[in-house]
Amino acid sequence: MVTYLLANFGGPRTSQEIVSFLQALLTDRDVTGGMIPSMLHRPLFSYIAKRRAPHVARQYAYLGGGSPIFQDTERLAQNLSQELQASVIPFHRYLPETHRETLQALQESQGSIVGIPLFPHYTFAVTGSIIRFFLQHLPEKPISWITQFGVHPEFVSCMQQHIRDCLAAQQIAVEDCYFLFSVHGLPQRHIRLGDPYAQQCQASFEALRGELEGKIAFQSKFGIGKWLDPSTQEVCQSLRTKKRYIVIVPFGFVSDHIETLHEIDHLYVPILLQKGYRVVRIPAINASSRWVSSLAAIVRSSPQETSLEPLLMP
C-alpha cells in the first residue's frame, strides 16, 4: 500500500493567516538563511513578517483576501487520489495551521509514502525545505521523493497543450505571439552551493518552447544579493519584437497564487501595455483534468529519491 504526499507552497486562506504565513516563510533558513547571522535570523525575520503583513494584505485583497492555492491543492489531491486509486494527503508548506492534520494523517498511514512536491524544478529553497520539514517532524516515517519533473514528457506535453488551448480560446494565432517563460528567481549563492535549479529551469524552458519564439526570465526577487537573471521586469522593459502579443507563461508554477495573479498582472503586464503590446497571461494548470492525468503518469514513471542528504541545503 502506498500513500502519496502532495506538497505545495501554501498560502493564506484569509487575511487572518497572512502574518503566520509570512513568518513561516521568512524564518525558513532554507529560504532566507545566509543573509544575516544565525542568532538574529528568527527574531529579525519575524519582525519583518509583521511589518510586511499590511502591504501583503493589500495584495491579497486583490485576490479576494486570500490565496486560491489552498483550495486548488486540496482539489488536485482529491482528483489525483481517484486517478491513482490511492490515498493522497495534501501538504501546505507555509500554512502552519494545517501541519498538525497532515502529520497525523501520515503518522496513521500504512505502507510506504511517496512525496510529490508540486514544483517542476528542484531547489534547496523549496523542495529541499519540504524534505527537511518531514525529516525533522516525522523522522520515523521514511519518505521517498519525486524531486523534479520539468522535462518529463507528460509535463511538457500538458503545458504545451494548455498554452495552445488558452490562445485558441481567445482566437490568437501562435504565430502572432512572443512567449515570455517566467519562473521564480533564486539567489546566485544557492547555485554556487550546488543547487541544480537554474540548469533544470533552462532545460525545461527549451523543452517547452520548442519552435516558439521567446525567452526565459526570473521573477519575484526579494532581499539582498545577486539573483538569477535576466529578471522578468528587465525583459519586459527591454523587449522589442514585431509580434502583436506577448504571452507570459509562468511555467514554474503549477498553481495560481499571488506571484502569478498579482505580481505578473500588476508589475509586468502594465510595462508591456505601455509599449503597445497586447498581453496574455497563461493561467497555471491548477487542478485541470489534463494535469491530473499527466501528474498521475509522472508519479507512475518517475524515479524516487531515498538518499536525502544531498538534496538539502549544505
Swiss-Prot record:
Protein name listed in UniProt: Ferrochelatase
Catalytic activity: heme b + 2 H(+) = protoporphyrin IX + Fe(2+)
Enzyme Commission identifier(s): 4.98.1.1
A Pfam entry, by short name: Ferrochelatase
Keywords: Cytoplasm, Heme biosynthesis, Iron, Lyase, Metal-binding, Porphyrin biosynthesis
A single GO BP: heme biosynthetic process
Transmembrane segments: none
Keyword DNA-binding: no
Gene: hemH
GO molecular function: ferrochelatase activity; metal ion binding
Keyword Cytoplasm applies: yes
Function description: Catalyzes the ferrous insertion into protoporphyrin IX.
Family: Belongs to the ferrochelatase family.
PROSITE patterns associated with the record: FERROCHELATASE
GO cellular component assignments: cytoplasm
Compartments, record wording: Cytoplasm
Sequence positions that bind Fe cation: H184, E259
